[in-house]
Amino acid sequence: MDSSADPRNASNCTDPFSPSSMCSPVPSPSSWVNFSHLEGNLSDPCIRNRTELGGSDSLCPPTGSPSMVTAITIMALYSIVCVVGLFGNFLVMYVIVRYTKMKTATNIYIFNLALADALATSTLPFQSVNYLMGTWPFGTILCKIVISIDYYNMFTSIFTLCTMSVDRYIAVCHPVKALDFRTPRNAKIINVCNWILSSAIGLPVMFMATTKYRNGSIDCALTFSHPTWYWENLLKICVFIFAFIMPVLIITVCYGLMILRLKSVRMLSGSKEKDRNLRRITRMVLVVVAVFIVCWTPIHIYVIIKALITIPETTFQTVSWHFCIALGYTNSCLNPVLYAFLDENFKRCFREFCIPTSSTIEQQNSARIRQNTRDHPSTANTVDRTNHQLENLEAETAPLP
């Protein structure tokens, strides 16, 4: 068991977030989104005071060129994830809102997933600044917002993927019931319910998050009641169970039943075209779920291991910790790429947005003209009456033959 989790060491390690060499801290849940608590941070007194300690403190991660290489690599990766994630997810939401044909039940769930991913990637600039400066300069309010957004993203994403898996199961295994259940309206209601469920952890985390001035820098972290080691590890275990184990079990059962159904029945709907679309959408959702699990499994496993045992702090441990966190965020920018490659409708809409053809421009112009006509019917009628009056006047004033 971690020494910081032992109540006998409470006198020497009263704060699990403290990077002091007196204790070996378990990274807090907020450290999943906050670089100020990661091993090897620039604000760590182990690094700042290495000269004073004579470089002999074995609890401090080794410094040197690997730390600089790690910092540059992390900043480059997070910049790419932020740009691609924001642009890609906003493009997904725009396409679903813009095109009527995209307003299906599955795409409504995809909209919810894109919204959660966009919110998560929007916090990366704040965390990058925090990592470079070694302190949190944005105040308590933004600290609460950034940490709560991370938890909202984690839970809303996995709840939405569970919903999409159940939705696919109903569409494949119970096609008759799917006609009444799988509607855009029901999908929107379920999305709202997913956000409400996520608030069960998102709101408490928002109240628990605060800024602390310690060792010459400001930390953005979660505060726990005493004994802190108990509540901190309890939160980690709850997150591991409800945001990973249970959802993965639900998804596995749904897709296991779907695979058995698809193998046993050659024709699902009586139409080859409908069956092809059904299998294509099911394959896309399966890939999205699989990528999510691959990206989030390492950080969940890592946090649980750190909560249970003491891991020696080495360069490899520091790099692997950063890599696990970066992998979790990378998932937020991968989904739009997956849609572009796996779904023909998304691919076509993305292409029209990026490279509009002449026919697309004409359709947009004609739609705009029709909209203006509907918005201003009196103006159109006035113009028609004026033209008619001019024609009558010309006929009346024309010279007789």
From Swiss-Prot:
S-palmitoyl cysteine lipid sites: C354
UniProt-annotated glycosylation sites, renumbered to this chain: N9, N12, N34, N41, N49
Disulfide topology: C143-C220
Extracellular side: 1-69, 133-143, 209-231, 308-315
Region (Disordered) location: 365-385
Residues bearing the modification Phosphotyrosine: Y169
Assembly and interaction partners: Forms homooligomers and heterooligomers with other GPCRs, such as OPRD1, OPRK1, OPRL1, NPFFR2, ADRA2A, SSTR2, CNR1 and CCR5 (probably in dimeric forms). Interacts with heterotrimeric G proteins; interaction with a heterotrimeric complex containing GNAI1, GNB1 and GNG2 stabilizes the active conformation of the receptor and increases its affinity for endomorphin-2, the synthetic opioid peptide DAMGO and for morphinan agonists. Interacts with PPL; the interaction disrupts agonist-mediated G-protein activation. Interacts (via C-terminus) with DNAJB4 (via C-terminus).
Protein name: Mu-type opioid receptor
